[in-house]
Amino acid sequence: NLMFSTEMGSTADGSMKIYLRPETAQGIFVNYLNVQKTGRMKVPFGIAQIGKAFRNEIVARQFIFRMREFEQMEMQFFVRPGEEMEWFKQWKATRLKWHQAMGLGNEKYRYHDHEKLAHYANAATDIEFEMPFGFKEVEGIHSRTNFDLSQHEKFSGKKIQYFDPELNQSYTPYVIETSIGVDRVFLSVMAGSYCEETLENGETRVVLKLPAALAPIKLAVLPLVKKDGLPEKAEEIMKMLRFDFRCQYDEKDSIGKRYRRQDAIGTPYCITAVSYTHLRAHETLANL
């Protein structure tokens, strides 16, 4: 059983057995008509959400790749019956482009089409990323047919069909689902950006080559030395930039060590405050 069970109630005798959700999707299905009506939406339309999910994994392993509690982003896209395969192909391509746009390298991604389908699906594929331990799923795209909505309708006894004004008829929509493990995407970014460089003296150092769009610190402002008015000039630069970029100011240790610290956290740009004297000295040495 993949679902975690627990009890709800103030006393043991009066408690009720409940289950933690293994996916976020079902909350969307039971509320889709409310969202459709209040948002005045027409098929095709999608509803997306992010939240916690829980699965009773027998073996939780590979760092944060497989956990019993994890963050999930899902979208349910409601379409007319008979049009689901066309939309499935479109979302399959769109979702791959989204992952590739992160800039980790297109060759690190691939599709894995399912040969054996779940009971609710008529098509399914995974987007896999090349982790240090092989290609692993980071997102699943599924054509769930109308199974979920039909089951909710059957067991609730309440009609939850959509009225299509263009066709002038009611029907149970088919659903294309995209499901992402947020922790897995984070792991793919870290794994795809982590590098170790070997120096001439045999030592190794870490460089986090994050794509600039994903880097938490966009730039660092560094005075070359802690004198000659350079810290004050660097702070002026910092004040000009901090409202537009997430910046970091650092004046401790040598300039080389400060560059190394920024390399280790994936900062794409560094601005170094130098004086005219330092520039002239550098130019003189370069010409020797």
Name each model feature, range by range.
Residues 1-280:
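NTP/phosphate- and nucleic-acid-binding module
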Residues 278, 285-288:
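Single conserved hydrophobic/aromatic residue that forms the stacking wall/gate
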